[in-house]
Amino acid sequence: MALVKVKPTSPGRRGVVQVVNASLHKGKPFAALVEAKSGNAGRNNNGRITVRHQGGGHKQAYRVIDFKRNKDGIPAKVERLEYDPNRTANIALLCYADGERRYIIANKGMVVGQPIMSGSEAPIKSGNALPIRNIPVGTTICCVEMLPGKGAQLARSAGTSVQLLAREGTYAQIRLRSGEVRRVHVECRATIGEVGNEEHNLRKIGKAGAMRWRGVRPTVRGTAMNPVDHPHGGGEGRTGEGRVPVNPWGQPTKGYRTRSNKRTNSMIVQRRHKR
């Protein structure tokens, strides 16, 4: 994997920095693990925008990823590494001893031919998935479940990882990249190591059109809108907000807490905000 600065043959190419990985598979994905993916342009079932700045972009196919890692005791080998347009991390195609194939999130340092195992008896090696009760304290892990058997939800993006801090009874404490310390059940599964493609954040897109290819639409300032469209809108000429900065729905944007799931507050030992 390397960072390549593109030759400035045009204004759109000037400044572009790409992440090049020669080990990625250059053909089509494994057909049995590919599903159709329809875009929703950030709209919900009522047709209203719930996520701004989404729409358009190149047509994508969804790769079915095995986030549960529940094929225990059967050894597998990494058949190939692939690019996945649906996430920042790369993915790996595993071929199990019984012939089944599954996609997983590719770990840092994962290579073709590497042996992979899942289950409580799996060795503590990068890429193997185990219940947290079988992982030594202090180990760097990724793809962590929040509920046993639900599938990985934490630390799935490129270059991310979680540190296992302690185990007390039926719960373990983990530190997320944000600094938050959280409790998870010891039966939750996690993958040893950290997610690969760690140089993803060092790339430079170069032009607006490249973001449109990815399905990202422009972000318009609230002060440039009309009053009917945004609380910051209106006024003659260029004007400031004239109030505490808010989003289009009037909710404060500077440090205002929006977490509403009070049911799991007890699982957060230390918030990412130290205040």
Curated annotation (Swiss-Prot):
Residues 221-275 are annotated as: Disordered. Keywords: Ribonucleoprotein, Ribosomal protein, RNA-binding, rRNA-binding. Residues 229-241 have a biased composition (Basic and acidic residues). One of its GO terms (molecular function) is structural constituent of ribosome. The keyword Kinase does not apply. SUPFAM superfamilies: Nucleic acid-binding proteins, Translation proteins SH3-like domain. InterPro entries: NA-bd_OB-fold, Rib_uL2_dom2, Ribosomal_uL2, Ribosomal_uL2_bac/org-type, Ribosomal_uL2_C, Ribosomal_uL2_CS, Ribosomal_uL2_dom3, Ribosomal_uL2_RNA-bd_dom. GO terms for biological process: cytoplasmic translation. Gene3D superfamilies: 2.30.30.30, Nucleic acid-binding proteins, Ribosomal protein L2, domain 3. Part of the 50S ribosomal subunit. Forms a bridge to the 30S subunit in the 70S ribosome. Belongs to the universal ribosomal protein uL2 family. One of the primary rRNA binding proteins. Required for association of the 30S and 50S subunits to form the 70S ribosome, for tRNA binding and peptide bond formation. It has been suggested to have peptidyltransferase activity; this is somewhat controversial. Makes several contacts with the 16S rRNA in the 70S ribosome. This is Large ribosomal subunit protein uL2. It comes from Dechloromonas aromatica (strain RCB). The lineage of its organism: Bacteria, Pseudomonadati, Pseudomonadota, Betaproteobacteria, Rhodocyclales.
